[in-house]
Amino acid sequence: MKKLAISIGDINGIGLEILVRSHEELSKICTPFYFIHENLLNKASKLLNLKLFNAKIVAFKDDKDYEFNFIKKENSLEIYSFCLPLGFKVDENFEIKAGEIDAKSGLYGFLSFKAASYFVYEKHAHALLTLPIHKKAWEDAGLKYKGHTDALRDFFKKNAIMMLGCKELFVGLFSEHIPLAKVSKKITFKNLSIFLKDFYKETHFKKIGLLGFNPHAGDYGVIGGEEEKIMEKAIAFVNAFLHSKKDEKFFKKALKDENLQKELLLNFKGKGVYLPYPLVADTAFTKAGLKNCNRLVAMYHDLALAPLKALYFDKSINVSLNLPIIRVSVDHGTAFDKAYKNAKINTKSYFEAAKFAINLSLKT
């Protein structure tokens, strides 16, 4: 079976409960490695009145060298150690504060995630599944990242792309956790062309639509529309480039050379992967809109996530594209209001994420 490295997220949230409750079923489809120290797992188990049986847990430690070892088997748990350069000393002796924002749990969740990421990168597992973190807890811990995807960009020096959804609807995010006021400035021909090229090469979707940035996609310039003009130009260029089968070197050169862009467009005939004009976002998510195109790109976070979660919240997942590792996540937060209360918790997104990761790993 495929091996999944699973980071625990913020231990003050619902992640640990999802992990423990789902372990038996998850183990039927993969071999999970949970990145948590035994004493913290015991504390959480006591609070939840739940036990984790027949599982593999990985204690991670800051060290200059990478080293993975089996330590012992105890109380039906297989305990491993994974040493790597984390940049922080690991503190696993703090108290769990159910439902609270806490710097210690924030830092621990980050280190669990970083260790699990490199565990996959070092080929000890086939994919990474991350449980939800709290961005404020990361900030309070002194971390500079706005979330998992932002950190992965830094770890692997790649332009990671966030995609969310399910088989009925997937949406790629051109921008993620930045203020709305900054999105327009980010929409440039170069930035968008690179994104569209990478998004297609990672997904190979047959038809992709871009959601307009302005109301009614600019309405022919009546409501703004400058961003839509840039989008149309980038769409035409990327469609022509993908059709041409030319290489990355040519792409980089053509980004700066309008004559090469014109040459590509003159030689391009027929339909492209991307629909030629931005879609009006307020109708793109209707039944008719999704029947026409259910693989979309949004210029900003909430333009995609508000309708996606209204339609498919329980089964949507988060996928990081354009990385040297496979990374998936649940598409929900820490749910501090439900943590350690034996509340009803839906685990569908967790299982969908695991299945998606397994299927992706079978293709690589």
UniProtKB/Swiss-Prot annotation:
Binding site for substrate: 148-149, 309, 318, 327
Top-tier EC class: oxidoreductase
InterPro entries associated with the record: PdxA_epsilonprot (IPR037539), PdxA_fam (IPR005255)
Required cofactor names: Zn(2+); Mg(2+); Co(2+)
Single GO term (MF): zinc ion binding
Superkingdom, taxonomy of origin: Bacteria
EC number: 1.1.1.262
Catalytic activity: 4-(phosphooxy)-L-threonine + NAD(+) = 3-amino-2-oxopropyl phosphate + CO2 + NADH
Amino-acid positions noted as binding a divalent metal cation in the UniProt annotation, renumbered to this chain: 177, 216, 301
Sorted UniProt keywords: Cobalt, Cytoplasm, Magnesium, Metal-binding, NAD, NADP, Oxidoreductase, Pyridoxine biosynthesis, Zinc
Flavoprotein among keywords: no
Family: Belongs to the PdxA family.
Protein function: Catalyzes the NAD(P)-dependent oxidation of 4-(phosphooxy)-L-threonine (HTP) into 2-amino-3-oxo-4-(phosphooxy)butyric acid which spontaneously decarboxylates to form 3-amino-2-oxopropyl phosphate (AHAP).
NCBIfam families xrefs: PRK03946.1 (NF003040)
Subunit and partners: Homodimer.
Note: The active site is located at the dimer interface.
Designated name of the protein: 4-hydroxythreonine-4-phosphate dehydrogenase
Organism: Campylobacter jejuni subsp. jejuni serotype O:6 (strain 81116 / NCTC 11828)
